[in-house]
Amino acid sequence: MKTIKGPALFLAQFAGDDAPFNSWDSITKWAADCGYKGVQVPSWDGRLLALDGAASSKDYCDTFKGQAEENGVEVPELSTHLQGQLVAVHPAYDEAFDGFAAPEVRGNPSARLAWAVDQVKKAFSASANIG
């Protein structure tokens, strides 16, 4: 990007189980209606992005990006805030940070670390596929 195109919105603070915040289509329409030009996507929220699919499929990402653009916003970045924090957790914070991890790796610091690293790597691939 050579120039700033306008305000973008971090969707993690709005994503939820009720419309319009519970699906990619409706939340991107809502963001555009609010005047935003872009949306930062939380890569951990499956209601908005299937990270495994995005990491492995350019077609998935083309559809994902295309739907956002049809609704009036761009996807300037994916967020890995939660997973990234889990890549280097001091043992004193194990319990506090465990809630950021997938349920199947909670309580197991080495499994949580492996999961977090894998999530960040998948987000890199997904970001490349989105373009």
Give the label of every model feature segment.
Residues M1-N129:
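N-terminal pre-domain/capping segments
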